[in-house]
């Protein structure tokens, strides 16, 4: 039975107003570590051993049967695991409506938070940490347990900055030769077979995630990113990622062998241990003194630490009931005290080993400490004492650990959520200052791993022409909807967009356009007119929309940066010596917004080619022509849903196919069409027209919902475009004559005369340049 006492003030009249701490069983709650939808994690201190623990308090009434089963399976797995680099389970308490899981507390927080604050690790330190991670994962696999959610958020750091693997919520048992079919995990760390919905072997899934983790440790960024889940899925399936200039050849080789798309060709843990990069420091770093053996924590082997049992008996805890609890894997108060005392003894012995001196004193025994007394505060009045403690005199024996376990609760209440790194550890990691130079991206070549012999092909394989300039982490992808072009460099200013809201990972995502300065396409005719102060980025061939999910919330690029055009030839690596002048530095520091969350059903994420076009969005909102947004109920130019991503995703695919096929459309001037007089060259402007005195709409619009044009109009020079549209099951209609507008008028847009120079077009119209080289008298209808 769990008794949970709330904060209560002293009775009226005493005037002190003091509050008793919140208690759960033998634990005093100190503060909140984290909150979720159905659970809260509290930092607590055991009242007997004075050890800090983490208590996960779960409201079972708010969980469905599947999630409750997941919680019970996590507890079952943690009961079977005992490893120095895996979070230990101390106690499980359950009532009708609540579940309390008491685990080890890692005082230095998540590895993710450390990387966001300090930048990436040096390869030597990353190797030490990766050895610890690898040993923990190998231990799980040896016990036929697969984790399935390995990521830096689940790698905790204890007081010695050692790794502690946590969160077995997606973990499960597996058997060799029996594939699993639960497609779960965190998208940036998930293997390709999870996105494809294929059955998989558990260890191969964890090895892919280990490759992503090692990349993040060394580079400080994610190898696979994207503004939304479909884009991320596409990049994971392609298996392409960037290699920074500072990564060694051996480290690159190991990462590439782990991040192989084909699970059958993926490296194994035994091969990882024998890899040249790992053998640079072959021995797993450990304490100078021998640590406790695994059977000290195992409940059913019958071999327990006699010193811990002796201390418990000295404190008045029934030895027989403690042994029974350990044998039955009860994980009750008796077992919790034993495990916590075992941890304190381990810390004490390691401290004795590290203490300098020619002669070390023997370990203290409880029988040698009969002159000490145990404070009885909190024990005599505890409701568990009759069942937990044996009849003892008022003066009990206290071990030498009791003096170390006593500490003030007031100081612990003022500690931050994640403890700062000790000054003695300042030289362990490579500090990364948070400066604008460290927040820039690098246009680094991407490579596709094809065929066997990855290590042999590294020096000879030339990278494909890169058509993307994406940022290196999920939160660093520019959210501007860049125009879709063939592989070429597009020079445009950086933009920033705000995250969209209210979307799901499985649907096409809405976006909110941002103001964007004018930009020019990277054609030879226009590149000569560009100033040398324009920042350089590559146009992305993927969806330019952003995601509102916590996993993939994007942030805009840094604006205002003035760099010279890129003047280097991209090869196998970005740079092996020094950065070229004007080349933006590789991001070596994660951002808080890249924190990932685990998902079930990753196989349901649809690819880019399967997105359904409902209605195209406006060119104004996509290209940042103006901050104008159409009303939600307005049809016409914006279709049924303003700002819809689905329409533009398909339109961009059509335009990409048109560019790649090098289709040219030169409409012949219709005899009945009168040409408007050519005014002086001026920028092309589209703006909303309101009021009764507005000019009539022009006859040429990019719109949706218009009736299909008759076949004769499609036979006047539009056959190449029509054939390209048929390949995509899309009706692309081109005409030069005036067309009647639908009954419900679309949002009214005014434009200047159609004879404007194409160089004045804003960035959102770059991809339309090939369709209107002569005039703007041609409209394109996508239905």
Curated annotation (Swiss-Prot):
EC id: 2.7.11.1
Gene expressing this chain: SIK1
Function: Serine/threonine-protein kinase involved in various processes such as cell cycle regulation, gluconeogenesis and lipogenesis regulation, muscle growth and differentiation and tumor suppression. Phosphorylates HDAC4, HDAC5, PPME1, SREBF1, CRTC1/TORC1. Inhibits CREB activity by phosphorylating and inhibiting activity of TORCs, the CREB-specific coactivators, like CRTC2/TORC2 and CRTC3/TORC3 in response to cAMP signaling.
Organism, scientific name: Homo sapiens
Taxon lineage: Eukaryota, Metazoa, Chordata, Craniata, Vertebrata
Name of the molecule in the record: Serine/threonine-protein kinase SIK1
Family named by the database record: Belongs to the protein kinase superfamily. CAMK Ser/Thr protein kinase family. AMPK subfamily.
Annotated consequence of substituting residue 248 to A: Decreased kinase activity without affecting much autophosphorylation status
Keyword presence, ATP-binding: yes
Activity regulation note: Activated by phosphorylation on Thr-182. Also activated by phosphorylation on Thr-322 in response to increases in intracellular sodium in parallel with elevations in intracellular calcium through the reversible sodium/calcium exchanger. Inhibited by phosphorylation at Thr-473 and Ser-575, probably by PKA, which triggers interaction with 14-3-3 proteins.
Disease: Developmental and epileptic encephalopathy 30: A form of epileptic encephalopathy, a heterogeneous group of severe early-onset epilepsies characterized by refractory seizures, neurodevelopmental impairment, and poor prognosis. Development is normal prior to seizure onset, after which cognitive and motor delays become apparent.
Modification sites for Phosphoserine: 186, 575
Result after altering residue 287 to T: In DEE30; no change in subcellular location
């Amino acid at each position: 039975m769990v008794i949970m006492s709330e904060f209560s003030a002293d009775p009226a009249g005493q005037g002190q107003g003091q509050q008793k701490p919140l208690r759960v069983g033998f634990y005093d709650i100190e503060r909140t570590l984290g909150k979720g939808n159905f659970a809260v994690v509290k930092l607590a201190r055991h009242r007997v051993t004075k050890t800090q623990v983490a208590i996960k308090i779960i409201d079972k009434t708010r969980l469905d049967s599947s999630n409750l089963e997941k919680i019970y399976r996590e507890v079952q797995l943690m009961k079977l695991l005992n490893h120095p680099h895996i979070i230990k389970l101390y106690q499980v308490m359950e009532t009708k409506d609540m579940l309390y899981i008491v685990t080890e507390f890692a005082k230095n927080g998540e590895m993710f938070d450390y990387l966001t604050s300090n930048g990436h690790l040096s390869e030597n330190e990353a190797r030490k940490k990766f050895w610890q991670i690898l040993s923990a994962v190998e231990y799980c696999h040896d016990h036929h347990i697969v984790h399935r959610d390995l990521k830096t958020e689940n790698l905790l750091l204890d007081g010695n900055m050692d790794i502690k693997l946590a969160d077995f919520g997606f973990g499960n048992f597996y058997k060799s030769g029996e594939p699993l079919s639960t497609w779960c995990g965190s998208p940036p760390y998930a293997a390709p077979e999870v996105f494809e919905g294929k059955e998989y072997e558990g260890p191969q899934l964890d090895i892919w995630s280990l490759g992503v983790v090692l990349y993040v440790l060394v580079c400080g960024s994610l190898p696979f990113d994207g503004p939304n889940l479909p884009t991320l899925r596409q990049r994971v399936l392609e298996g392409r990622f960037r290699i920074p200039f500072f990564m060694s050849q051996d480290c690159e080789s190991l990462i590439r062998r782990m991040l192989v798309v084909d699970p059958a060709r993926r490296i194994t843990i035994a091969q990882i241990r024998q890899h040249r990069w790992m053998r640079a420091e072959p021995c797993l770093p450990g304490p100078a003194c021998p640590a406790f053996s695994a059977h000290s924590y195992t409940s059913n082997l019958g071999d327990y630490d006699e010193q811990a049992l002796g201390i418990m008996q000295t404190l008045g805890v029934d030895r027989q009931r403690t042994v029974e609890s350990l044998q039955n894997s009860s994980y009750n108060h008796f077992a919790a005290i034993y495990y916590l005392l075992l941890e304190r003894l381990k810390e004490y012995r390691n401290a004795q080993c590290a203490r300098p001196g020619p002669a070390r004193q023997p370990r203290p025994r409880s029988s040698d400490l009969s002159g000490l007394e145990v404070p009885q505060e909190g024990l005599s009045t505890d409701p568990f004492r009759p069942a937990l403690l044996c009849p003892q005199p008022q003066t009990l024996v206290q071990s030498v650990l009791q003096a170390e376990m006593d500490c003030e609760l007031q100081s612990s209440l003022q500690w931050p959520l994640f403890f700062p790194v000790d000054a003695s550890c300042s030289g362990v990691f490579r500090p990364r200052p948070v400066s604008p130079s460290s927040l820039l991206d690098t246009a680094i070549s991407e490579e596709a791993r094809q065929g066997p012999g990855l290590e042999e092909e590294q020096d000879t394989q030339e990278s494909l022409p890169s058509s993307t300039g994406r940022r290196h982490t999920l939160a660093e992808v520019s959210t501007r909807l860049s125009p879709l072009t063939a592989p070429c460099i597009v020079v445009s200013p950086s933009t920033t967009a705000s995250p969209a809201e209210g979307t799901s990972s499985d649907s096409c995502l809405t976006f909110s356009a941002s103001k964007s300065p004018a930009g020019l396409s990277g054609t030879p005719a226009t590149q000569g007119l560009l100033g040398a102060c324009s920042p350089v980025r590559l146009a992305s061939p993927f969806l330019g929309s952003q995601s509102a999910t916590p996993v993939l919330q994007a942030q805009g690029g840094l604006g205002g940066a003035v760099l010279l055009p890129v003047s280097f030839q991209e090869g196998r690596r970005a740079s092996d010596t020094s950065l070229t002048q004007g080349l933006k530095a590789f991001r070596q520091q994660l951002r808080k917004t890249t924190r990932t969350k685990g998902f079930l059903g990753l196989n349901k994420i649809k690819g880019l080619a399967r997105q359904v076009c409902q209605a195209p969005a406006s060119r104004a909102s996509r290209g940042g022509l103006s901050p104008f947004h159409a009303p939600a109920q307005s049809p016409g130019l914006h279709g049924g849903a303003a700002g819809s991503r689905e329409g533009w995703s398909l339109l961009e695919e059509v335009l990409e196919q048109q560019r790649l096929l090098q289709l040219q459309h030169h409409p012949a001037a219709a005899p009945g069409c009168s040409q408007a007089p050519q005014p002086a060259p001026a920028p092309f402007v589209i703006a909303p027209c309101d009021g009764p005195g507005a000019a009539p709409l022009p006859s040429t619009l990019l719109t949706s919902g218009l009736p299909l044009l008759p076949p004769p109009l499609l036979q006047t020079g539009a056959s190449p475009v029509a054939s390209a549209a048929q390949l995509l099951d899309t009706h692309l209609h081109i005409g030069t004559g005036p067309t009647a507008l639908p009954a419900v008028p679309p949002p009214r847009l005014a434009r200047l005369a159609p004879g404007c120079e194409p160089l004045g077009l804003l960035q959102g119209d770059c991809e339309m340049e090939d369709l209107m080289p002569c005039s703007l008298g041609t409209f394109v209808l996508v239905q």
